A protein has these predicted regions:
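Glycine-rich hexapeptide-repeat left-handed beta-helix
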Residues: 1-20, 53, 59-74, 78-86, ...
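N-terminal segments that cap or nucleate solenoid repeat domains
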Residues: 4-44
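Thr-Gly-centered strand-to-loop micro-motif
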Residues: 27, 52-53
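N-terminal beta-strand/beta-hairpin edge segment
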Residues: 46-48
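Short HxH-centered metal-ligating active-site micro-motif
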Residues: 93
């Protein structure tokens, strides 16, 4: 697949067009709208919706956003003058059918399938969030731990092998997106 084909997935909002580059893979069924900045070697998989319409979305390098995930933001208001942008760091794996809304994620994070992270939540680097977890608004998850549940609870410190896996997971998806870009 030619990299130029993904431009059909990019839509402007109020004259602001998503910023992508030739190292990105964006599946033809994904939709990216408005003020969204995507760093190098990011992959956006089938049926992802990313709406940077009422605030900004930033996705760091080597990050993968898997099938069916929704990325959105919180509008600026008198109660919340800056709103809540969505900031996703580098080497992040966002599993299938997650919802990330106006939150901040550091680097080397795995967000398990079906997890929901709400407005104002801060996820520090080197965190593993289990499948189906709910991170409530304004909650901070500190670095180096496994979190699961609804609402999310800190379970235990990550093992060295699990911390290494966080980075490896993102690199696996960089390799996969490179295969897709080559048409393999």
């Amino acid at each position: 697949m030619s990299n130029n084909q993904f431009t059909n997935n990019l839509r402007s909002y109020k004259g602001i067009f998503p910023k992508v580059n030739n190292s990105n893979y964006i599946d033809p069924s994904a939709v990216i709208v408005g003020d969204v900045t995507i760093a190098d070697d990011v992959s956006i998989w089938p049926l992802v919706a990313a709406r940077g319409d009422v605030n900004t979305i930033s996705i760091g390098s080597n990050t993968n956003i898997q099938d069916g995930t929704v990325l959105h933001v919180t509008r600026k208001s008198t109660n919340n003058p800056d709103g809540n942008p969505l900031i996703i760091g580098a080497d992040v794996t966002v599993g299938h059918k997650c919802m990330l809304h106006g939150c901040t994620l550091g680097d080397r994070i795995l967000v398990g399938m079906g997890a929901i992270i709400m407005d104002g939540a801060i996820i520090e680097s080197d965190v593993f969030i289990g499948a189906g977890a709910l991170v409530p608004p304004n909650k901070t998850l500190i670095s180096g731990y496994l979190y699961v549940g609804n609402p999310v609870k800190q379970i235990r410190r990550l093992k060295e092998s699990e911390v290494a896996f966080l980075k490896q997971s993102s690199l696996n998806y960089v390799e996969l997106k490179n295969d897709y870009l080559k048409g393999e």
